[in-house]
Design a protein with these regions (language model features):
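Short, basic/polar N-terminal leader/transit segment immediately after the initiator methionine
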Residues: 3-6, 369
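Sec-dependent N-terminal signal peptides
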Residues: 5-13
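C-terminal motif of bacterial Sec signal peptides marking the signal peptidase cleavage site
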Residues: 15-18
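Predominantly soluble domains enriched in secretory-pathway, periplasmic, or organellar proteins
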Residues: 20-383
C-alpha cells in the first residue's frame, strides 16, 4: 500500500464516509441501467468519488438505488459551464445542511455542491485539504499547508475551521501532514502523519473547540497516523505502519516492513492501546463497529488481505480473509462504507489506469452486486 499521502486515498472516512439522509427532491441525471437488487435500506443514493489518475481530474458519480441507474460525472452534468471540471485528486467528502463538501487535494480547493442537484455553490481555497468533519455550525478540514514531499523544510500542517453559512475561515497549526480528525467531548482530535518527513509523526493534536486552540498533544504508540473515528467513548486511529524501500541488483524496489498497519484506541485521558492483530489500511465506522481491511501477513513478507470487524465496546474482532471468500472479487481495495440499515458492505476496487469498481456484500459477506465506476474510486457516501 502506498505511504505517500498525496497518492493515498481516504478517506475514509476515516475518509471516513458519512451515512446521512438528504431531502428527497427528484433530480434526473443521465445514466445507464444497473442491477443493484431491491433491499438497499432506506437510502436512495450512493455518491461515489473518483480520485482520477494522479494528478488527473476527479469525478463524482451517483448510484441511484431507486431508479436502478448509474450516473457518471454528475458534477459535469450539473455544471457544464465549469470547463475545468470538479478538480484534481479528491480526498474526502461529507454532507451537511443539504450540501456536499468535496476536498480536492491537488487543486488546493474545497468544492461545495448543493444537493440533490450537484450545482456548484462555492469554491474555497484550502492548501492540500485531506479530511473533513462537521461539528456544530463549522466544517473542520485538515490541511498539509503547502508541505512538499522530499523538501528539507518541515512545514507544520493546519486545521481549517469554516463557518458553513458565511464561509468565514480560521486556522490553527497542528503537527506534520495531518490526516483524519474526530470530535469527542468538545475536543477535536487530529491525526498527524508526518508522511512527507523521513521521521513520521506520532502526535495527536487535541483542539478545544470552544477556543479553537491546541490544548495538548498525545503521543501515540505508533507513527504515520491516518484515519480517525469516535466510538464507545474513545477515539480510534489507524496507522500506515513503517517500511523502507531498497533496490535489488536488478533494480526492482523491495519493501521491508518494520511496523505493521494498526488500529489504536485513545482514551480522553490520553492513554492508548494498540489492538493487536488488526492491520487497518482503510476503515469506516457503523454504529459501534469498525470495519477495516489490511494485509494480515505484512510482517512476514506475505500477502493475506483480510477484512476486520472490530467491536469497539470490548475490542474483540472477527477476521475474514479475502482469499477463499466472495471478497476475492476485490483486486485492490481502496475504500469502504457500511450501510447502517441493512449491514451491506461497499468496497471500492480501484484502478488508476482504467475504470474501477464498487462491490456490495451483505452482512454475511456474500456478494450482492458490482458496478463499474471511474478512475481511482476511493470514497463513498450514502444518502
Amino acid at each position: 500500500m502506498k505511504k505517500i499521502a498525496l497518492l493515498v486515498f481516504s478517506a475514509v472516512l476515516v475518509a471516513i464516509a458519512a451515512c446521512t439522509k438528504e431531502n428527497t427532491s427528484e433530480v434526473t441525471f443521465a445514466g445507464i441501467e444497473v442491477e443493484v437488487g431491491e433491499n438497499n435500506g432506506n437510502f436512495s443514493k450512493l455518491y461515489i468519488l473518483n480520485e482520477g489518475a494522479y494528478p488527473g481530474a476527479s469525478t463524482l458519480d451517483l448510484l441511484d438505488f431507486k431508479n436502478k441507474k448509474y450516473c457518471t460525472d454528475i458534477f459535469a452534468q450539473a455544471n457544464p459551464e465549469v470547463v475545468q471540471g470538479l478538480g484534481n485528486t479528491a480526498n474526502d467528502m461529507a454532507v451537511a445542511d443539504g450540501k456536499l463538501w468535496v476536498l480536492l487535494n491537488a487543486s488546493n480547493q474545497v468544492a461545495v455542491l448543493h444537493l440533490p442537484d450537484a450545482k456548484l455553490e462555492k469554491v474555497l481555497e484550502v492548501d492540500s485539504p485531506r479530511f473533513i468533519v462537521n461539528e456544530g455550525k463549522y466544517a473542520y478540514i485538515t490541511s498539509y499547508a503547502g508541505a512538499v514531499y522530499g523538501s528539507e523544510d518541515m512545514v507544520p500542517g493546519k486545521v481549517y475551521r469554516i463557518d458553513r453559512t458565511s464561509y468565514a475561515v480560521s486556522t490553527v497549526e497542528v503537527g506534520y501532514q495531518p490526516e483524519g480528525l474526530a470530535v469527542l467531548n468538545g475536543k477535536l482530535y487530529v491525526a498527524n502523519s508526518g508522511g512527507y518527513n523521513w521521521v513520521h509523526d506520532n502526535r495527536i493534536s487535541v483542539i478545544d473547540l470552544s477556543t479553537f486552540t491546541v490544548e495538548r498533544t498525545i503521543e501515540a504508540p505508533v507513527t504515520n497516523l491516518f484515519q480517525m473515528c469516535v466510538a464507545s467513548g474513545k477515539v480510534w486511529v489507524s496507522s500506515y505502519g513503517e517500511s523502507t524501500w531498497t533496490q535489488d541488483s536488478q533494480g526492482d524496489w523491495i519493501q521491508s516492513v518494520s511496523a505493521p498497519q494498526s488500529l489504536t484506541s485513545v482514551n480522553p485521558d490520553g492513554t492508548c492501546q494498540i489492538l493487536d492483530g488488526v492491520h487497518a489500511d482503510k476503515m469506516t465506522l457503523c454504529g459501534k463497529t469498525i470495519y477495516c481491511f489490511g494485509n494480515d501477513d505484512e510482517m512476514t513478507g506475505g500477502y493475506n488481505l483480510c477484512l476486520y470487524k472490530v467491536d469497539t465496546e470490548n475490542s474483540n474482532f472477527q477476521k475474514t480473509g479475502f482469499a477463499g471468500s466472495d471478497l476475492s472479487r476485490v483486486a485492490y481495495p481502496y475504500g469502504i462504507l457500511v450501510n447502517p440499515d441493512n449491514g451491506d458492505i461497499y468496497i471500492c476496487d480501484a484502478s488508476f489506469t482504467a475504470g474501477s469498481k464498487v462491490h456490495c456484500f451483505n452482512a454475511s459477506l456474500k456478494h450482492k452486486w458490482t458496478v463499474d465506476t471511474g478512475v481511482g474510486t476511493g470514497h463513498l457516501l450514502l444518502q
